[in-house]
């Protein structure tokens, strides 16, 4: 991360800056780049902020919807998920800082492969899946298997399952259904 490229909103009041010193805010980006490990480019289809109270260690999460129109740099307003594709984490963090009056310096970026590896390292995740969701997961599982070289099985019907990484990532990608 090139800190010289990170912008902050200079109009933040001294009072707000004082309050912000008691907190750490971490930007979290989930990329839909299908390049299996290349975290330097791609649209950030997931943008979340983790705000940590340094005294109490309380964590609050906020999601910034990917279709939110923000100034992504140089006065250009477009869907905020374009900032990461346009200028990497520096541009995406700058966009959040300038538009939301923040001073973010830390971030985490994941892609499909990162999610798959994390879930597999944890031994899977227990989920109750509906018949509709099992059907919708099929195409995503096929695509993720091709991208990653995995051989995860499709779910033929609903039920309670311990999903492996590919299956969990496929489930997370469902955008519609009953």
Report residues per predicted region.
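Non-catalytic, solvent-exposed segments at the cell envelope interface
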Residues: 1-178
